[in-house]
Amino acid sequence: MSQKTLFKIQYINLCIDEFARKFRLTPQVAHNYLSRYKGLEFLNEHYDYEHTQALWQTQDALRTICQRNGGTL
C-alpha cells in the first residue's frame, strides 16, 4: 500500500471521527451516514484538495454534500 493511500485512509478516519463528534454520533453511525449520503465518496474523490483545508471547512462541506443527497443533519 502506498504512503498516499495510508494518509488518505487516516484522513478519512479523522473526518469520520470529527463528524461524529460534531453531530454527537457514534463513529459507526457517522460512517454509515456519510456512506449513505455520499460524504465518503466526496472525501475519496476530493482528497487532494480537502486535506489541505481546515477541518471545520471539510466538515461543513460534508454536511452540505450529505444534505444535497438526502441527509437531514
Regions of interest found by a model, annotated:
Residues 12-15, 43-44, 62-65:
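N-terminal, charged low-complexity regulatory/assembly segments
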